[in-house]
Amino acid sequence: MENLQVIQVATGMISIPPNGWGAVERIIWAYQNRLERMGHKVDIRYLNQVNYQPNTIVHTHIANLALDCKSRGIPYVFSLHDHHSEWYGKGSFVFNQNLEAIKGSIISFTHAEHLVEYFSETDKLFYLSHGVDTEFFTPEYSSPKSGQHSLLMLANNGLAGNSGFDRKGFRFGIEAAKHLDLPITVVGTDNNLKFFEAHPDLMEYEKLSIVANNPTDEETRKLYQSHTIFLHPSMLEAGHPNLTLLEAASSCLPIVGTYKGSKEIKGLHIIKDINTNEVIEGIKKTIDDYENIWNSMYKVREEYDWMHVAQKLAYFYKYVLKVNERYDSEKTKSLYVKAYSETPRYV
């Protein structure tokens, strides 16, 4: 494949590489890192710094920036990262803005398969999985003995400005830990302190540890390595799998949580209903077969690396350039399908 010229449009909210909690910024950084390893040239620029040239791919990650590209006459690729578009629903301002961004793009990506159907008003939306740095998030394994398991939850809780909204299922994880008499660590930003202020009863569990200091990547890696089960009973995500789930998978940390997708995640016990009993049963089953689960995760962990995602992304980019040659809509669609079929299926 010929070398590509790519501009990833910065969100303008958090620096890249991110110096704190910023999922979209981590994704942009990962795209640049892996695409450059493949020999492509990737710049990260603010939109007002973009001087569009033919044969350059401009990739935006925020709907209003995508629409700004459209108004400036800049052809663009768009990634949908906004879980609010599903939360507020069809017809809402957020949904309509993201739909307009998708329709105005050359091609758009969602990182949750079910959202392709959810945005049924357009045929420009394709699924592209998230990835993980498998070279960084590595396992450290010693078989835990009975009674020595420890649970980990890692998330920034809340929804739509309400820090007390339990989108990530902290209550279910903590109540399950209490029922099983297991230690649990809840990690995230200082915003999580506001969640616990709204739910003071959860802090009564003496084996609960709260880490709300926005941990560094190195601290996060050690947390994955020092716990034995990852809990992710989340009710709303823009990524399936999301970033923390893949970090846990790369670290060979068995997972009990929610997931919508056809791609199998080894070591993931999927809870169908989000409640405490489901989490308890998932933890029990994971403990009962821990050795086999860990081994199955170790065998496939490298398949989740960002490099595989970048390879698929590069194929799409290649066909984006062909679409820019003014193919008709049917030809355009066939090019998208061809790009999808030519790349590895596990991403």
For each feature predicted by the language model, list its residue ranges.
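Donor nucleotide-sugar binding/catalytic pocket of nucleotide-sugar-dependent glycosyltransferases
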Residues: 103-139, 146, 154-156
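Conserved catalytic-core segment of nucleotide-activated headgroup transferases in glycan assembly
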Residues: 146-200, 217
